[in-house]
């Protein structure tokens, strides 16, 4: 994707709950990911890569600090349910020297565009030169999200993937050619949890998955260990809806179609960012990385 240079630009796209089996280039003929498939043909495709923790916040902390959860101390998702107990502008990784801070010292301009989920989103700009993020980490909907955009606060009605893609392209377009940049584009999709994927898809890929039998998702029963784990969470009273809904998603066809449609939305965003780099003649001098915080419990294991 890029030619060797002293300080290449870096674009790190981080999807949310996107499993390795959720791409055409990994053998899934039901999902629609033409841009990721094209990228894989000229890139290194890691087939044995493992996330440090199958929870959102620990993975994000690890990618920004280079530390394992046992080192940075974040072992589960950071839940806004307890936000009233947080210090003002609390940043869960504030004590560590993070990737964007290291790159800034090397002369990079740095930007977080997308989901933060490492404490109070108000604190995200402290470690990035530019920040456009969501005011909460948990994804309740892909639409009507409250946005933190520098000093501005507003609600954006459209799909969050399109919104953050637009912001990423704006950032690339305004970056100086004299200074390398690090763009951490963190999509809050495909996500895979209710209520965000509950029901049939309504985005522009809805027709593609209409009536799909979703044969790429196993139809086996849920293991006893998973049921026991869910029961423990329910007994602890986490959340309002009960974690037993997680057991329903792998066998709920409308939700699965919705989930795959959100994967296609992410793929579309990847394609648009690649095109923006090519249009600005930056593709050959940009290290382009696509990854996910972790996968999604759809029954493959």
What are these regions (language model features)?
Residues 4-8, 15-31, 136-159, 163, ...:
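Active-site-proximal cap/lid insertion segments
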Residues 116-119:
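Short, polar loop motifs at secondary-structure junctions
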Residues 39, 121-123, 171-176:
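A general structural signal for short secondary-structure junctions and capping/turn motifs
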Residues 12-13, 19-98, 102-111, 122, ...:
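Active-site segment of extracytoplasmic enzymes that catalyze sulfate/phosphate-ester chemistry
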Residues 126-127:
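Short, structured coil segments at secondary-structure junctions
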């Amino acid at each position: 994707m890029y030619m060797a240079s002293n300080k290449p630009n870096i674009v790190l796209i981080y999807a949310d709950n996107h499993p390795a089996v959720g791409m055409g280039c990994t053998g899934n003929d039901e999902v629609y990911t033409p841009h990721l498939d094209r990228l894989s043909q000229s890139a290194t495709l890691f087939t044995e890569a493992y996330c440090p923790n199958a929870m959102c916040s620990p993975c994000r902390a690890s990618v920004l600090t280079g530390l394992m959860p046992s080192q940075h101390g974040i072992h589960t998702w950071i839940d806004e349910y307890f936000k009233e107990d947080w210090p003002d502008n609390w940043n869960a990784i504030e004590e560590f020297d993070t990737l964007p801070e290291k790159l800034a010292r090397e002369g990079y301009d740095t930007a977080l565009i997308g989901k933060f989920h490492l404490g109070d989103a108000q604190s995200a700009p402290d470690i990035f030169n530019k920040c456009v993020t969501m005011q909460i980490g948990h994804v309740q909907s892909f639409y009507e999200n409250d946005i933190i955009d520098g000093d501005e606060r507003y609600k954006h009605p459209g799909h969050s993937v399109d919104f953050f893609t637009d912001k990423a392209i704006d950032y690339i377009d305004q970056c100086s050619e004299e200074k390398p940049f690090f763009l951490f584009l963190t999509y809050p999709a495909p996500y895979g949890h209710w209520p965000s994927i509950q029901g049939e898809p309504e985005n522009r890929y809805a027709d593609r998955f209409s009536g799909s039998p979703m044969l790429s998702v196993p139809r086996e029963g849920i293991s006893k260990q998973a049921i026991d784990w869910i029961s423990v969470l329910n007994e602890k009273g986490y959340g309002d809806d009960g974690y037993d809904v997680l057991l329903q998603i792998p066998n709920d066809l409308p939700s699965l179609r919705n989930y795959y449609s959100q994967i296609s939305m992410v793929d579309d965003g990847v394609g648009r960012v690649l095109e923006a780099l090519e249009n600005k003649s930056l593709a050959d001098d940009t290290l382009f990385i696509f990854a996910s915080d972790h996968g999604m419990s759809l029954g493959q294991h």
